[in-house]
UniProtKB/Swiss-Prot annotation:
Residues 431-449 have a biased composition (Basic residues). Residues 272-284 have a biased composition (Low complexity). Residues 217-240 form a coiled coil. It is found in: Chromosome. Disruption phenotype: Mice develop normally without obvious somatic defects but males and females are sterile due to defects in homologous synapsis. Oocytes are depleted in six-week-old females and spermatocytes in males undergo apoptosis at a stage equivalent to wild-type mid-pachytene. Complete synapsis is never observed and incomplete synaptonemal complexes are detected in meiocytes equivalent to late-zygotene and pachytene. Required for DNA double-strand breaks (DSBs) formation in unsynapsed regions during meiotic recombination. Probably acts by forming a complex with MEI4 and REC114, which activates DSBs formation in unsynapsed regions, an essential step to ensure completion of synapsis. Not required for HORMAD1 functions in pairing-independent synaptonemal complex formation, ATR recruitment to unsynapsed axes, meiotic silencing of unsynapsed chromatin (MSUC) or meiotic surveillance. Pfam families: IHO1. InterPro entries: IHO1. Residues 372-381 have a biased composition (Polar residues). The keyword Phosphoprotein applies. This is Interactor of HORMAD1 protein 1. GO terms for cellular component: condensed nuclear chromosome.
Length: 574
């Protein structure tokens, strides 16, 4: 809606009697009393200088007339109608540009003064409002600044506390990280060390296990060898027990009793009271060799000790014995040694060719020592002459035949030995034993004695031949149960063999005692030595085999245990 039209309608709606209630200033300034408001307004368009004076009064009158409208306009912040009307261009004249169009005969100075006043008032109002706004803003500005300062301070405090807490937390986190890293490093180092030590221990355990395994394997092989050895030893022990079971102990004891019950024959004697060197009796030294649990459980050797001085015409023959286990004869063979007479004069030996036939008596039981330990006392009581023990010619011939059958390849050697023994016995036949007597000559020996000696020498030669044949036979007594159970030892070399005849009233010289003193041998070994017996049993088990059953005495000589020899009755001071 156009403001100008609105203003016209408003002006037309104003009652006519309103001019009476105008203020006094209106009356004072009124040039024409008969003009109404519309006329005035209309005239102001043409005469602006007149309307300027009436403008404040019109404003006041308008406010009084329309209080509600003014209030509404104030609420709406709208300017008054007069201000609007004046602000609008002139109704007829308009702007200065259009002054030529509607030029009215109005004074120009008055119209310009009214507009200037209006503009100044308007400017003043705007300046006042601006100043009030600025004043209010400026008055609030310190408070805002104070608030900003307080807020900034609070923010700084908060930031400082926050930063301090953050720094503290960061420091604690860093320390925690450092401690954790150090602990982890220590743990890793310890774990690496433990791992290295464990690996070293595992290597050591592996080496130890390998060594133990090697030892176990070696032990297993040793156990297998021991088992095999135990089986072999068991077999050998069984064979040994079988061989021992073949021995007849009662028969052996009977043969020993027969041997000890044979009467002893007196030697070749001559009456002489001037005998300087008494003849030494055949002293049997029973020695027990090392006990070998072989085919012959125990071996006893009877030997004669060597003479101390050859000039004293000491007798040095050997003794030998044969044990025949055959069921036919059952006779214990005995051989008597040949004797030779003494040369008249200074007592030197003339017959130097008679060899020692054998060295040892070989027995098969330990009980032989109990019987033979009593023999020296029997011969000492018998005393005078050479003890010669013989056996029947029939038993000797049977023995020789058995030896020849067992060892046919050694037959010529046995015969050769027998011939040599016969020849030596024949040479001894015609030589009488002579002894010097003080101041008297001895009578020649009777031929009867010589015949007896010849017969004894023949039997002795045959027995010695049997011993030699048995020595060279490779078969063992266990393999040939019909053969004699003996072990032949190597005979000594030929020595001076003489026969000393003990005179009834002759005195023993100091040299004879010295010769007898040399008969004692001190190399003896206790029969109760259990440790030596255990070693001997081990040696026997190692030497025992089915192919070679030779008696251990033939392979390895043992230490002999000597018994006390028998002496002459005149040797009481020995």
């Amino acid at each position: 809606m156009n403001f100008n039209v609105w203003n016209v309608k408003e002006m037309l709606s104003i009652p006519s009697g309103s001019g009476i209630t105008k203020p006094s200033n209106w009356n004072n300034n009124q040039t024409d009393c008969s003009l109404s408001d519309s006329q005035f307004l209309f005239g102001s368009q043409f005469c602006p200088e007149n309307s300027e004076t009436l403008l404040p009064s019109l404003d006041a009158g308008a406010c009084l007339r329309h209080p509600k409208q003014t209030q509404q306009n104030s609420v709406d912040s709208e300017p008054s109608i007069f201000i609007k009307y004046q602000a609008k261009p002139q109704l007829l004249g308009g702007d200065t540009k259009d002054e030529s169009l509607f030029s009215l005969p109005l004074p120009v100075g008055k119209s310009k003064g009214l507009s200037k006043q209006f503009e100044e008032k308007k400017r003043r109002a705007t300046d006042q409002s601006d100043s009030e706004t600025l004043h209010s803003f400026v008055s609030h500005f310190p408070e805002v600044i104070n608030k900003l300062q307080t807020s900034v301070e609070k923010t700084e405090e908060n930031l400082s506390s926050r930063s301090q807490s953050i720094l503290d937390s960061v420091e604690t986190i860093a320390k925690t990280f450092q401690e954790t890293a150090r602990v982890q490093h220590d743990l890793m180092v310890e774990s690496v060390r433990d791992k290295g030590s464990m690996e070293q221990a595992i290597l050591e355990i592996q080496r130890t296990c390998a060594a133990r395994q090697a030892e176990f394997m070696e032990m297993k092989s040793t156990l297998k060898n021991l088992e095999v050895l135990v089986v072999e030893q068991t077999k050998n022990l069984q064979q040994f027990c079988d061989n021992l079971s073949q021995l007849i102990v009662p028969g052996i004891l009977e043969e020993l009793k027969k041997f000890t019950s044979v009467p002893q024959v007196a030697g070749h004697l001559k009456d002489s009271t001037s005998q300087t060197s008494p003849s030494l009796t055949q002293s049997l030294h029973f020695t027990r060799q090392e006990k070998h649990p072989s085919e012959e459980p125990a071996t006893w050797q009877a030997q004669e000790a060597p003479a101390g001085n050859p000039s004293t015409s000491s007798q040095r023959p050997g003794e030998c014995g044969v044990w025949d286990e055959g069921a036919e004869s059952g006779v214990f063979q005995k051989a008597a040694l040949p004797t030779d007479g003494l040369h008249r004069g200074d007592g030197h030996v003339k017959n130097k060719t008679v060899p020692t036939y054998c060295k040892n008596w070989v027995m098969t039981t330990r009980s032989v020592s109990n019987h033979f330990s009593n023999l020296p006392s029997q011969r000492a009581g018998n005393g005078q002459g050479l003890m010669a023990q013989g056996a029947s010619q029939r038993d000797v011939s049977k023995f020789e035949a058995r030896v020849k059958n067992a060892c046919p390849e050694y037959g010529p050697q046995s015969m050769c030995s027998f011939d040599s023994l016969e020849q030596s016995a024949t040479e001894q036949k015609g030589r009488p034993c002579r002894k010097r007597r003080r101041g008297k000559k001895q009578q020649p020996q009777r031929s009867k004695r010589g015949g007896l000696l010849d017969r004894k020498q023949g039997q002795t030669s045959k027995a010695a031949c049997a011993f030699i044949a048995r020595h060279h036979c490779p078969q063992s007594p266990v393999c040939d149960p019909q053969g004699p159970l003996i072990c032949w030892l190597t005979p000594r070399s030929s020595t001076k063999s003489t026969c000393h005849i003990l005179g009834g009233t002759g005195e023993t010289s100091q040299t004879a005692r010295a010769a007898q003193g040399n008969l004692v041998q001190h190399s003896q070994r206790s029969s109760t030595d259990s440790s030596s017996q255990g070693d001997q049993q081990i040696n026997w088990f190692s030497d025992l085999s089915l192919e070679n059953l030779e008696p251990p005495q033939c392979k390895k000589g043992g230490t002999n245990l000597l018994c006390d020899p028998d002496f002459d009755s005149s040797d009481d001071n020995f």
